[in-house]
Amino acid sequence: MIEFANERVVSFSLDYQDVFWEVKPTTEDLQQYEFYVQRSEAEAGPWLVIAGPLVDRYYIRDSAVPMITTNARTLFYRIRALHVPSGKETYSATVDREGLPNLMAREMIRRERILFEEFVGTRCWLFPRRSFGQRCPNCYDDVLGKKIDSQCPTCWGTGFSGGYHYPTSFWGQLDSSEETEQVTTEDHRRVQHSQVRAGPTPAIKPLDLLIDFQNRRWRVVQCTGTASLGATIRQEARLALIQRGSIEDKIPLKITNASVRLVPPRN
């Protein structure tokens, strides 16, 4: 099978994004390959095919960007190569406009990953919140232009069918929760906040759902991080604990406890 190289997303316009890719030198007949360009709002999918089949073409222009692009949304791309005679397929790396880090940044990311996976991190899952696509057929009101049921089991209160993209597992350092009692003249309630530090992937943004190794559900309320030459090295996010009984408690997380390591080995 062929191997991809130099995948990149480039654009200096608000009207489109250009996706380029190359193939490493090979003795195979490239005329027997079909390329399909896929786009997603989350690194783990689901993926939408936006171009293909392409034969001996290594560039496309995504002109649907103006309808779905905002400052708070990152679009990810990958290329699927299908060998028509054999039916075998392979995929490129997932890329966005930020691009791939240089060697120094990759080494910093590698050391951070070892730190989180072997010493200070715990297993977490990130559900990226949907922000475009099919509106919820059950709770979205076309006349009012908004969702009318915050406890809808179809969109999980987001207004978009499905609510969240596929979850991504990662290792992150989760701080002890900060507890605050909010007291008013009518009632009072306890609010818990925390902070999580993680590597550059998966990309975390406000309103995403994070589930920790204790099955606590957190809402991302603020994001920041560290970058080198435009490439993200570390992400830091402030979290708010979702109250018990909320609709987010019913979102299923399908894992096998026997095969998942939740915390690093304790020496």
Protein language model features and the residues they cover:
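Active-site-proximal polar cores
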Residues: 99-146
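Short beta-strand-centered aromatic/proline hotspots
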Residues: 209, 216-227
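Beta-strand-rich modules
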Residues: 62-87
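Short beta-strand/loop turn elements enriched in aromatics
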Residues: 125, 157-193
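Solvent-exposed loop/turn segments flanking beta-strands in beta-repeat/beta-sandwich domains
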Residues: 23-49
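Glycine- and charge-enriched low-complexity intrinsically disordered segments
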Residues: 115-123, 239-267
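Short, solvent-exposed secondary-structure boundary/capping segments
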Residues: 183-184, 226-243
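Pro/Thr/Ser/Gly-rich low-complexity, intrinsically disordered linker/stalk tracts
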Residues: 1-30, 86-105
